[in-house]
């Protein structure tokens, strides 16, 4: 029994009860005049408009007291729902008398009209109308029928869209807090409610006073606007603003968007047992470890520490109860640190870095306690997180239950995320220092200390290195028999001497015993070492070296290939061991290499002046021709920019030729550790042509490089590009994130539902081309997919792949070697599984390299894989200065959005609707168009194109239905009308692939 139940405070008349009711008891405001609900009137499509069959504009005039609406025409020539102005209303009253017809304004009028709607009858009429309606009329009828049937089903009445009462949310949900200095901070809702109450009370008073109609009308309109602002401020007219001209947040804003109730508080909550800190590199960590600062660990694992302290009991330095355990922790007793070590062991934690663009943005690690306040991250997982150590922060979460810990350990450990879900290539690969270390280690040099020495074992080689008898780059011989029995050497090879370098012997020690010895950076080496590297005992090895050219060092791409090979052959555990070894070796050797950069490493090009002189002379010639009127301004511009661009390329090739292979800057860019040729080119060559803010190329190039220094004008020209770079990055991130969200939204239901859908349709795939350039080779398209039909070698007639067999690397190689150009594979496009896809149509799971499992959320993975590289795509819509391509080419992210949204692309190509012959092409200079006539078997079509369109056909050419007449992107909506769904899907697929490949991003 509650003691104070039903007692009311005698001072202020408030019921005495628990404070919880402040969150649940609602109030209401009884309105003196009905008010329409803005969601139903202003929402798109307007629900009121559809029910009443009136335009939103007419409704607005009625609701906000601009026009009268006829409710009952009586025996006058007026029509029901006709709008009349104030003046017309007076005139009709004088003409027909005041009682003959009924017209009203405001929400009352709407309410009466809605109350008269007979839903059942309405639905019948609309169904009859649908039988013979077409086009716009039909669309509108369908929409109206949807709304009417929804009303019938829900049992709501249309007139309820007009409110007589406004509910008031509980006071704790719109709090008011006292600040120091006696002022109050309050929720915006209180202001909005106050406006409604004030206007409502004023209206009541005016009605009691029998005030003139126009004043009452004005007050009713103001009440309507106040309620609108309360429900959805800013939806109609200017938003009501509070202090500092800030629009007030209405009820709708509390729910809407990223900061709204749903996304902020229901889908994303702040959780306990989490923290965030700056990250720092932890080269001492193993692949599945992270360094956790002790301070954070004590806080994160508190309940576990308390539990363990109580288990220990006081006799072992622990505690008897929670209170004393808490005291021990607060006092930082030594026993707490010992317990912490125990608790943390084998308890995985999750690390997340925002923005989480793909599933590798959250991974599990085993914590290792470290001093300091920064969390330590393994250097190899930085790629997956897109993290660097310039002040990035990361969040950490502790899985509590046994199930959560098991899930983190089995599915999320960093060591098992070696391949990227987007293309199946290793995402953890050595970078920067580690790359340059392994590059330096595997470099060969001719004629240095100890060349031609022969050793009996790898240990002997390392001993000679320590004694400075040989160097890392020295070419030596080693007895092949000294290697492990498992090494795939033939008996003939084992009896001979293998030639290699000291560094490569050390590098090969980190590879598995039965993995081929890697001696040159070629993929053939993975199937066994080339026989030419084995010499008979007694051969003049020094003489052999003199005639043999040097093998290249292992660059970052090749290191990735090694990792992929190890993963394919030995699975996760061995790969993560290799990665750690590669990391340690890389750091060690790059430290020992003493690689530095100095000013004189930026080589100067003596020939540069000549090239620039030639270019200047050529530009002067072009300008002269323009002055004489031999060239148009556009032609002059194109030729000038082309001249400079050619000069740039010439200097670039000279620069590449002049680089010494020992030059540290060259080594950095060549190994793939940092920088690329265009960075070096700006340092030592010339900066080249720059773009103006409007995207047009400035025809005056920056001829200086950074080593010489830029003059003021050149520096100024360069700033455009820098500014564009910054703004682009900011815009790109937002756009790319939004694209990912929309993609996930549509694709999240696509799940692998069954083993085999039994479809009999496949997809013919061949290499995707763009002109003569291969965008994606056939190998990449068939790898990991199932064959729909048997693949037969055209030369021998043997079956390479049976029907429904998965095409793995070995089979794919055979198909390519047989010279086959097109393969029919099973594809998601032709899968017949309902609400998802089947295993056979999907194929291999990129992230594991195994066949996909039933239940895998492949839709979400695909959406993330497209969205994640989105930030690397450019935002550019190219503006070509001249008329050469007068349409702007949309590229990068905007192009991807254009394809997915199936919008009308910019500068689109016309598609032929008939198969036939091009009979004539006529230019009409007057209206700047050209007309292409195509004569089909049954009818002739004419296509009018802009005069600048570049045609794909000439007179007399044959053209097929659904082929493009001119250059440019196709409109998917047009394409699907004249061809099949499959062809359209294929076109969109190839186009998206093209955009990503042009930016050097692979998605499979």
Curated annotation (Swiss-Prot):
Record has Transferase as a keyword? yes
Top-rank taxon, per record: Bacteria
Note accompanying the cofactor annotation:
Binds 1 Mg(2+) ion per subunit. Binds 1 Zn(2+) ion per subunit.
Q: What is this enzyme's EC? A: 2.7.7.6
* Positions bound to Zn(2+): 757, 831, 838, 841
UniProt-listed Gene3D superfamilies? 1.10.132.30, 1.10.1790.20, 1.10.40.90, 2.40.40.20, 2.40.50.100, RNA polymerase II, clamp domain, RNA polymerase Rpb1, domain 3
Enumerate the Gene Ontology biological process terms. DNA-templated transcription
One GO CC annotation: DNA-directed RNA polymerase complex
What are the entry keywords? DNA-directed RNA polymerase, Magnesium, Metal-binding, Nucleotidyltransferase, Transcription, Transferase, Zinc
Cofactor(s), by name: Mg(2+); Zn(2+)
Catalytic reaction list: RNA(n) + a ribonucleoside 5'-triphosphate = RNA(n+1) + diphosphate
**Which positions does UniProt annotate for Mg(2+) binding?**
388, 390, 392
Task: Give the molecular function GO annotations.
Answer: DNA binding; DNA-directed RNA polymerase activity; metal ion binding
Establish whether keyword Nucleotidyltransferase is in the entry: yes
SMART domains to which the protein is assigned, alphabetical: RPOLA_N
Q: Which HAMAP family match?
A: RNApol_bact_RpoC (MF_01322)
Assembly mode: The RNAP catalytic core consists of 2 alpha, 1 beta, 1 beta' and 1 omega subunit. When a sigma factor is associated with the core the holoenzyme is formed, which can initiate transcription.
NCBIfam families hit by this protein? rpoC_TIGR
The text of the family note is:
Belongs to the RNA polymerase beta' chain family.
Q: Tell me, what does this protein do in biology? A: DNA-dependent RNA polymerase catalyzes the transcription of DNA into RNA using the four ribonucleoside triphosphates as substrates.
Q: What is this protein called?
A: DNA-directed RNA polymerase subunit beta'
Origin species, per record, is: Oenococcus oeni
What is the organism lineage in this UniProt record? Answer: Bacteria, Bacillati, Bacillota, Bacilli, Lactobacillales
